[in-house]
A protein has these predicted regions:
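Extracellular glycan-modifying ectodomains
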Residues: 1-208
Length: 208
């Protein structure tokens, strides 16, 4: 399983209920749908231009004003656990990290192994758009798209055997989700055989 956002909850729950330990490109980002599509259409290039980044007032996120993507677990923090005003000094390291994750994303998608992409808060029109974008990028890839929503959003209208409808209640205030409904949904869809293989304490979130 590979997270396509919308936020950290997806990556966190994938780790809790599988053997996955390594990071993927979108794992610890907040990614609005339009930002996700823009990132994919750009082949994950040019998303960290210095003149497009700004520090949010609460100093918890660096935001991209062009894509709307928010980086909360990427830039180093100071002793007060804030992202410092001089966050751009850390940009070379952050770019190196995302260059690596970009290469990993494409290498995995070009392998013979099937992939299930997982996206939270996505309607049927968006699901179809995302499926078509992934197919255009990786025409030989055997993939599924698991769409996670708290209620019925008409995903059946997309009429695609690739799209999996997962109904999972909205997460708690910590943004990491409720493990029990995730375990039930992932197991029921055949996406994991190892629910609760890790505890919350086992999962390392960078700069959390």
């Amino acid at each position: 399983m590979v997270s396509l956002g919308r936020a950290c909850e997806v990556a966190f729950q994938i780790r809790m209920h599988s053997d996955k330990i390594d990071s993927d490109f979108f794992d610890w980002l907040i990614t609005p749908f339009d930002g996700l599509m823009a990132a994919l259409r750009s082949n994950l290039d040019g998303l960290l231009e210095a003149d497009e980044l700004y520090l949010q007032n609460d100093k918890n996120f660096v935001n991209n004003k062009k894509t709307g993507i928010q980086y909360g677990h990427v830039f180093m923090r100071d002793e007060s656990h804030n992202i410092p005003d001089n966050f751009l000094d850390d940009l070379p390291r952050v770019r190196d990290k995302f260059d690596y994750l970009r290469d990993k994303f494409f290498n995995n998608a070009k392998s013979d192994d099937p992939i299930c992409f997982v996206r939270r808060d996505i309607n049927s029109i968006q699901a179809k758009m995302l499926e078509e974008q992934l197919e255009a990028m990786f025409p030989s890839l055997d993939f599924k798209l698991a769409c996670v929503n708290a209620e019925d959003v008409g995903l059946g209208d997309a009429k695609s055997p690739r799209i999996i409808d997962l109904r999972i209640v909205n997460g708690a205030h910590d943004g990491l989700g409720f493990p029990e409904p995730w375990a039930e949904a992932l197991t029921g869809a055949g996406l994991t055989t190892k629910p609760f293989v890790k505890t919350k304490e086992d999962i390392v979130i960078p700069f959390h």
